Amino acid sequence: MAPTKGKPSTKGKSAKLGAKSSAKSKSSASKPEGISKNRQKKLTLAKPGGAQKTKSRTKDGRKKKRVYSEKELDIPLLNGIVPAGIAKPKGEKKGKIFVDDPASMMAIMSVVNAEKEGRIESKITRARQLEEIREAKRVEAEGRRDEKDKAFEERKEGLKKKRRRSAPAKGGDDDDEGKAKKSKKDGKYKARKRVSFG
């Protein structure tokens, strides 16, 4: 490659550029970009390590007045009929005491308790009846099972007796069986056709 004359001049330019960039970096370190001068002064005067707290004020510079609701002010309701049972005395839970006279309240309670006890008693009697019905069904099922077992045992015994009776008779009647077979083969009875698959 042929040497060019512009090389030394480029070195001079780059040196100037380097000096400018270093100057800019120094100034940027001291002053953050994008912040107004007034804000920069405040930041330099602020205590290190803590964020500044600003008081929230309205446009006029006055504090906001609190608005109270009707419930908080205890304003009485006008033209409202409140039943005695629903009226809630201050400091007490709603709906706990409806009757002023304790004797009448006890009378009401006894009536309600009697009704509930009657329901409970009826439930208990119903449960007892159902239990008796279940017991009767179970006994009946057991009786049926016993009868079936007895019938089964009787049949077994009957079959055993038949075998015992027929066993000695078979030994003496060999000639009779042979005659019966011959008579079948003579042509009176048709021989069954046997078909095998396989």
Swiss-Prot record:
Keyword hit for Membrane = no
Ranges of compositional bias, category Low complexity: 15-31
Its annotated compartments are: Nucleus, Nucleolus
Q: What keywords sit in the KW lines?
A: Coiled coil, mRNA transport, Nucleus, Ribosome biogenesis, Transport
* Coiled-coil region: 115-135
**Any GO CC annotation of this UniProt entry:** nucleolus
Enumerate the residue ranges of region (Disordered).
1-70, 127-198
Q: Where is the composition biased (Basic and acidic residues)?
A: 127-157
A GO term (biological process) for this protein?
intracellular mRNA localization
Q: Which family does it belong to?
A: Belongs to the LOC1 family.
The protein depicted here goes by the name: 60S ribosomal subunit assembly/export protein LOC1
